[in-house]
């Protein structure tokens, strides 16, 4: 019984980054493109470089999760379906939704969940790309949903 209590305590102490503290939200905006999104600034505290296009990468302080918020020109005026097809996503995608205005895809790679959503507006593609530990998937559900649904651009 004592070992069960120790295990429960260890699990409680190692709570996920996503649920350990109340989440502080801010609005992140890419000034050059108008891309914006609700951003959990209390989770993604470290800048982690820039993508090849407009935007920024961030990671958690412990490096277990990362996010890229970016915007890129839609040079070939692709629809979400055409753009996604050109990226050759893996065949074993767990979640896929494609509409005339956006796509969202998610699956597992090694011990991580990856989630990508891209909204199409005019000549720009506005995206959020998130990777986080698969063992914390349920703790991240509401956070990922809020970020995804708040993604917008002009």
Each model region followed by its residue ranges:
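Short, low-complexity, Pro/Ser/Thr/Gly-rich segments in the mature regions of secreted, periplasmic
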Residues: 140-153
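Generic detector of short, well-ordered, non-transmembrane alpha-helical segments enriched
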Residues: 14-16, 39, 147
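Conserved polar/disulfide-associated segments of primarily extracytoplasmic proteins
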Residues: 22, 45-142
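Intrinsically disordered/low-complexity terminal segments and short unstructured peptides
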Residues: 14-16, 25, 34, 67
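N-terminal "mature-domain start" segment
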Residues: 21-52, 151
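Positively charged n-region of N-terminal signal peptides that target proteins for export
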Residues: 1-4
